Amino acid sequence: MIEGLLGRKIGMTQVFDPTGQVIPVTIIEVGPCVVTQIRTKERDGYEAVQIGYQEVRAKSLTKPEQGHLRGAGKLLRHLREFRTDNIADHKVGDVLTVEMFAPGQRVDVIGTSKGRGFQGVVKRHGFGGGPRTHGQSDRLRAPGSIGAGTDPGHLWKNTRMAGRMGNQRVTVQNLTVVDVVPERNLLLVRGSVPGANNGLVMVRRAIKGS
């Protein structure tokens, strides 16, 4: 059995536990996903199951993409692979639903963070900025020295500087499943998950969770 499914982030709300405690949750529409390809060690060098999510019209896909999905019986926008040692448990065309998850289970959620554009070091890296007084000007949000006068006197790779922020793959680990609503393909997890509403996310069984 593969370890995860694809879905989209719906948004956040809150629910109450039996003691009346408020729990912030993110609602994720998970699946249904369709198995589109089986990767084998003999043919591909590794074993994995490729699944697809979100049906689209034929004109939204190229002819090669349509041909690739012919065996699955559905045209799907998003394709992702999950490594597994039990490819015999799946075949092309199988439908996977949110019922593979259960309340109380721990999951990891992978998404793409919101893009913030070009940002300075204070917002991007949390720098404190320069002095606000004693004759300083235009130094409030400056990064300060980036290495001049040190040994060696050059700029090191990965020095934290201004640049594009966000729009990167982010994984949030060990979120607790609060509820599962199979008839609506909904998964409620405690806390926040990366990305904007309606953004594509990948939900998998927690790697580090108990």
From Swiss-Prot:
Family matches, as Pfam families: Ribosomal_L3
GO BP term, pick one: translation
Region named Disordered: 125-151
InterPro entries: Ribosomal_uL3, Ribosomal_uL3_bac/org-type, Ribosomal_uL3_CS, Transl_B-barrel_sf
This protein's record includes keyword Ion transport: no
Keywords from the UniProt entry: Ribonucleoprotein, Ribosomal protein, RNA-binding, rRNA-binding
Signal peptide annotation: none
Cysteines joined through disulfide linkages: none
Keyword rRNA-binding: yes
A molecular-function term among this protein's GO annotations: rRNA binding
A GO CC annotation given for this chain: cytosolic large ribosomal subunit
NCBIfam families named among the record's database cross-references: L3_bact (TIGR03625)
Family: Belongs to the universal ribosomal protein uL3 family.
Known role: One of the primary rRNA binding proteins, it binds directly near the 3'-end of the 23S rRNA, where it nucleates assembly of the 50S subunit.
PANTHER family noted in UniProt: 50S RIBOSOMAL PROTEIN L3 (PTHR11229), LARGE RIBOSOMAL SUBUNIT PROTEIN UL3C (PTHR11229:SF16)
Subunit structure: Part of the 50S ribosomal subunit. Forms a cluster with proteins L14 and L19.
Protein name in UniProt: Large ribosomal subunit protein uL3
Origin species: Roseiflexus castenholzii (strain DSM 13941 / HLO8)
Protein encoded by which gene: rplC
